[in-house]
């Protein structure tokens, strides 16, 4: 029996399109896949909103921070990374969180003292927020949907958002900000053309 190529192509195209159609009609399907980091905002530590949309097209590191953590000295490395690449377009937002070990119990004054005065941080800091669980900030819920196996397990978990607004790389707590793999990933994103 001869095969009608047009019928076969139509059948194949229909079979391939069906899952895509089903995904786009689902509430968490294609519509969610179009959401990028640039859709979110954080309340700023000192009041002004930090709108990630203002960073559209620029690589962005979002890192959950804590003042009383053994990893708190990473603020210095984060600032060094920020200063190294900021003029080329890197943006960074620190998100103080008390989620892990209660290591960010203070308010604005304590967070500012640690980040700005002790470590010289110049990148924006958000208001204290939850980064895990049902009350997590919407950015962190989105990041968990983008990278479900790479969610924060402790303070100083780093998301690198690429120029396209999607997560390009994730660096766990123990990865120092100035390690070659972080520096290389940031440099790659800065040279990437959209």
What is the predicted role of each segment?
Residues 38-39, 127, 162:
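Terminal helix/beta-alpha structural elements that buttress the NAD(P)+-binding lobe
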Residues 141, 145-194:
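Thiol-/selenol-based redox modules, centered on thioredoxin-like
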Residues 55-70, 92-95:
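Short active-site neighborhood of thiol/selenol oxidoreductases, capturing the structured segment around
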Residues 23-53:
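N-terminal "domain-start" segment that seeds a small globular fold
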Residues 1-15:
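N-terminal secretory signal peptides and thylakoid transit peptides that target proteins
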Residues 71-136:
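Structural microenvironment flanking redox-active thiols in thiol-disulfide oxidoreductases
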């Amino acid at each position: 029996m001869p095969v009608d190529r047009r019928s076969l192509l139509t059948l194949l195209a229909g079979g391939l399109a069906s899952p895509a159609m089903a995904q786009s009609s689902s509430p968490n399907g294609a519509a969610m896949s179009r959401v990028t980091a640039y859709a979110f905002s954080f309340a700023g530590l000192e009041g002004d909103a930090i709108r990630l949309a203002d960073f559209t097209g620029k690589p962005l590191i979002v890192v959950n921070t804590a003042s009383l953590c053994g990893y708190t000295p990473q603020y210095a490395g984060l600032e060094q990374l920020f200063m190294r690449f900021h003029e080329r377009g890197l943006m960074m937002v620190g998100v103080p969180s008390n989620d892990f070990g209660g290591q960010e119990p203070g308010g604005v004054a304590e967070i500012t003292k640690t980040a700005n005065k002790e470590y010289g941080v110049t990148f924006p800091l958000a208001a204290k927020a939850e980064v895990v669980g049902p009350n997590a900030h919407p950015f962190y819920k989105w990041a968990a949907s983008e990278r479900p196996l790479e969610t924060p397990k402790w303070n100083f978990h780093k998301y690198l958002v690429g120029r396209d607004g999607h997560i390009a790389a994730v660096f766990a707590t123990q990865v120092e900000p100035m390690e070659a793999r972080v520096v290389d990933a940031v440099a790659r994103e800065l040279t990437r053309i959209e």
